[in-house]
């Protein structure tokens, strides 16, 4: 069992990583006997895990209600958020309730925002079931829903009480979702840890076949890196912005193509190549290192080009609505070397468009 602590003073919390955690009531601390829980999951995961998690919580004396959401990025919306509020109010659940997010990034982000908002804030626990949510979205307290004009535009910083990562969930993950999660894994190597990127080049095949020790190390290292960044910059005023490598471009793809048509990790993968091409055009990143990124992404089964039907010009309106924009100016996360990156302002729109075009025709 691996245990990492996100250090945020009184709001510090553990990330527990192991197989078989759904069999142990102690995995879901700080829940105690007699407490009330709203378990939030989706229609795909409910048949796989709902009864199991409900059973282990009830075994611990917890009173469990549940709400099952539709599955897909397009349902990460205000309308679906309202169904969670309605379920909480109908039971009813008070300010002492705990929301448990059992699912991937959509369930986790939406449930976290519900917890941040319901009666001005109730406790919640993240139980991520996808690789992407286990290595990234469940850690750090970013919660949100989407708007038709932009991804994650309505949300709050709100930390969970704990994160429970059961590696067994990956056994039911579709290959496309596994690849999507690997995009965020590769991101950590590019922006923060060149040695980890090297390890990924050597061990990617083991991750693709869900080798237990390799996957446990991979998830632990990603969570360690994320925890360090969040502890240093919880509200993304500086260092934490680096975690958005590829996301400014990727969110544009998701919004333009319709949420759910491109998985988040797929869009981020293409976006990371666009960021690398931008950095190349600025003369601060080598084409050889861009090729290393492209090769690893392709091995993971990820796209390295944007959608053919989306012109370079179509990216700009979305990118100019990005949450990192300051005083009307785009701020891009750009690699300087494998393992080192920066937040860069003042890059001309023409250069960015040319970098995007490089990835459309490649």
UniProtKB/Swiss-Prot annotation:
Query: Which class of enzymes does this protein belong to?
Result: lyase
Please share the entry's free-text remark on the cofactor. Binds 1 divalent metal cation per subunit. Displays higher activity with Co(2+), however, Zn(2+) may be the physiological metal cofactor.
A GO MF term: zinc ion binding
* Species whose genome carries this gene: Escherichia coli (strain K12)
Tell me which family the UniProt entry assigns to this protein: Belongs to the sugar phosphate cyclases superfamily. Dehydroquinate synthase family.
As for what it does, the entry says:
Catalyzes the conversion of 3-deoxy-D-arabino-heptulosonate 7-phosphate (DAHP) to dehydroquinate (DHQ).
Which gene is this protein's source?
aroB
Q: What is its EC number?
A: 4.2.3.4
Q: Where primarily located?
A: cytoplasm
CDD domains reported for this sequence: DHQS
The protein's matches in InterPro entries, at most eight in alphabetical order, are given as: Dehydroquinate_synthase (IPR050071), DHQ_synth_AroB (IPR016037), DHQ_synth_fam (IPR030963), DHQS/DOIS_N (IPR030960), DHQS_C (IPR056179)
Q: Which domain of life is it from?
A: Bacteria
A Pfam family it matches: DHQS_C
- Swiss-Prot/TrEMBL cofactor(s): NAD(+); Co(2+); Zn(2+)
Which terms are listed as keywords in the entry? Amino-acid biosynthesis, Aromatic amino acid biosynthesis, Cobalt, Cytoplasm, Lyase, Metal-binding, NAD, Nucleotide-binding, Zinc
Q: Where in the cell is it found?
A: Cytoplasm
Binding residues for NAD(+): 71-76, 105-109, 129-130, 142, 151, 169-172
Annotated residues that bind Zn(2+) are located at: 184, 247, 264
Q: Under what name is this protein listed? A: 3-dehydroquinate synthase
Is the keyword Cell division in the record? no
Pathway it belongs to? Metabolic intermediate biosynthesis; chorismate biosynthesis; chorismate from D-erythrose 4-phosphate and phosphoenolpyruvate: step 2/7
* Subunit structure, as described in the record: Monomer.
> What Gene Ontology terms describe where this protein resides (cellular component)?
cytoplasm
**Gene Ontology process terms (BP):** amino acid biosynthetic process; aromatic amino acid family biosynthetic process; chorismate biosynthetic process
Residues spanning the signal sequence: none
Which chemical reaction does it catalyze?
A: 7-phospho-2-dehydro-3-deoxy-D-arabino-heptonate = 3-dehydroquinate + phosphate
């Amino acid at each position: 069992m691996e245990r990492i602590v996100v250090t945020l003073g009184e709001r510090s919390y553990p990330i527990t990583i192991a197989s078989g955690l759904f069999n142990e009531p102690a995995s879901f601390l700080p829940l105690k006997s007699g407490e009330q829980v709203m378990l939030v999951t989706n229609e795909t995961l409910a048949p796989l895990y709902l009864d199991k998690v409900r059973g282990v919580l009830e075994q611990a004396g917890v009173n469990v209600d549940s709400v099952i959401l539709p599955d897909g990025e397009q349902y990460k919306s205000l309308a679906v958020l309202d169904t969670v509020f309605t379920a909480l109010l109908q039971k009813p659940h008070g300010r002492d309730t705990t929301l448990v997010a059992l699912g991937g990034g959509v369930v986790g982000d939406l449930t976290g925002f519900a917890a941040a908002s319901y009666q001005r804030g109730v406790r919640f626990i993240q139980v991520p079931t996808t690789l992407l949510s286990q290595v990234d979205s469940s850690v750090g307290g970013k919660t949100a829903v989407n708007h038709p004009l932009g991804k994650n535009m309505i949300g709050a910083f709100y930390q969970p009480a704990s994160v429970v990562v059961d590696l067994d969930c990956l056994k039911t993950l579709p290959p496309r979702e596994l690849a999507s999660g690997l995009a965020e894994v590769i991101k950590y190597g590019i922006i923060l840890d060149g040695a980890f990127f090297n390890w990924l080049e050597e061990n990617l095949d083991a991750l693709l076949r869900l080798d237990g020790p390799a996957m446990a190390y991979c998830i632990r290292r990603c969570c360690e890196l994320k925890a360090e960044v969040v502890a240093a910059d919880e509200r993304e005023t500086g260092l934490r912005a680096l975690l958005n490598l590829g996301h400014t471009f990727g969110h544009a793809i998701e919004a333009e193509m319709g949420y759910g048509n491109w998985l988040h990790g797929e869009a981020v993968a293409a976006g990371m190549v666009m960021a690398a091409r931008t950095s190349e055009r600025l003369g601060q990143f080598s084409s050889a290192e861009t090729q290393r990124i492209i090769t690893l992404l392709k091995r993971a089964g990820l796209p390295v080009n944007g959608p053919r039907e989306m012109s370079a010009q179509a990216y700009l309106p979305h990118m100019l609505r990005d949450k990192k924009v300051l005083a009307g100016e785009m701020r891009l996360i750009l690699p300087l070397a494998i393992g080192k990156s920066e937040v860069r302002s003042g890059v001309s729109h023409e250069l960015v468009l040319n970098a995007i075009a490089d990835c459309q025709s490649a």
